[in-house]
Amino acid sequence: FIKNDVQKATFLKKGYDGDNRKFNLSQDITCKLYRSFSKAQMKMSISQLEKFRACPFSHFIRYGLRPKTLETYDIEKRELGSFIHDGIEAFGRYVQENYATLESLSEEALRTFLQTVLEDGAKTRFEHHRLSSPRNQFFLKRSKENLYDLMLGIIEQMKASRFRQVGQEVHFGQRGSLPPIYLQLGEDVIALEGFIDRIDKATFGENSAVIVIDYKTGKKEIDLSKLLDGLDLQLMLYLMAASQNQDEAAGAFYLHLSDELLEVDFREKEKILQAFKKTLLFDGLVINKPEILKAIDVNYDEKNPTVLRFYGRKKDVIEKDNVLSTDKLTYLLDHAKHRAIENLEAMYQGDIKIYPYQTNKDNACTFCTYKAICAFEPNTSEAYRLVEPIDWASLDKMVG
C-alpha cells in the first residue's frame, strides 16, 4: 500500500505520528479564559481544582472553552442523582426548622412532606414535556420511593447520634455564612469557595466539634491515595472551612444516596434491611477520641454500627485505618491546602496538557465528556499520570 499510493500513505503516517502535545497558554490568555483569575473575581471552587488535577486538558475544555452540551429528552442518571440530592437537602432543612426532637416526626408527616417537596422539585428541575414521558415517570417514581427509604435510614442515624445538624448547603465564601479559604498565588490571593451539603455539631462542656457530610449519588469512597495526590480535596477542605470558628475538626464523610437496586443473595427481610443500612454508613475519616466517636454513633463499638463505617482488620475501633489521631487529621488538612495551591499555580501557568490520572481502580477518561476532543491514545507516545496506591500504614511515616 505504501509503495502503490505514497500520498495516502504519507497522510496516514502523519495521523499516526501526530504530536498531540499541548503547550502552556500565555498568562494573558489564561487570565482571560478562566474567570477565576479575573481581578473582579479572584475566587475558585474545589471541584475546579479537582478537575484540573484529574486532567489539565479536560479542565481547560470545561472551564476555559466552556462548550455547551446537547440536552436530551430522557432524564439521565446524573439528573436523577441531583434530584435525590435536592430531596435529601430539603428533608434536612425541614427537620432542622420544624422538629426539636426526631421522635415527634411521624411517618405520615414524612410521606406528606416527601410528596409535596418532590412534586415541586420535579417541576422545577425538569421541563413539562420530559415529565410526561412514561420512561421518565417510571424512574422518577422509583427515585421518590427510594428517597423515602433513604430518609428513614438517615432519621435512624440522627437518633443514634448526639451531633445535630446546624447547616444544610452551607456556603463558605466572600458572601457566605462561613469565610472562604484563602490561597496565596504570587502577590495575589484566591478565595476558595463552595457549598457544604451538611454540617453537624456537638458540644462537650465548653468546647464544640463539627463534622461535615458530603452527599454522593455515585460510587465514591474514601481513598487515601487520591486524598494525598490532590484528586479528592473536597472532604478535607470542607472540614477546614467548617472548623474555622474555633470548633474542633472531628470528621469528614461521604453519605451515599444510591438510586441503584441492592443486590443480595438472601431473601430474609431483616437481612435485606441490614444490608441497605450498611450502604448508608458514613464513609470517611474521624478523629480517634472515644467521646466524639460515641457522640457521632452511640453504637460505634458494636458489631453493627449505626452511623460510621470503619476500615482495617484491627478489632479495636480506635485503631481502625480511618480513625485518625489529631496529628494525622491535621496533616491531611494541611496537605489538602498545599495540594490546592500546587494545582492553582499550575493552572495559572497555563498548563493544558493531556495528562489524565490513572490508579489501580480507575482513570480520568472513564466518564470524561471530552474524549472525542482530546483523542488521547495511551498506547502511543502519550501516557497516563500514574497515581500509586498508598496504604494507611504509610501515613504513620509521613506524620512521623
Task: Go through each PLM region and give its residues.
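Structural signature of nuclease core domains in nucleic-acid processing machines
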Residues: 1-400
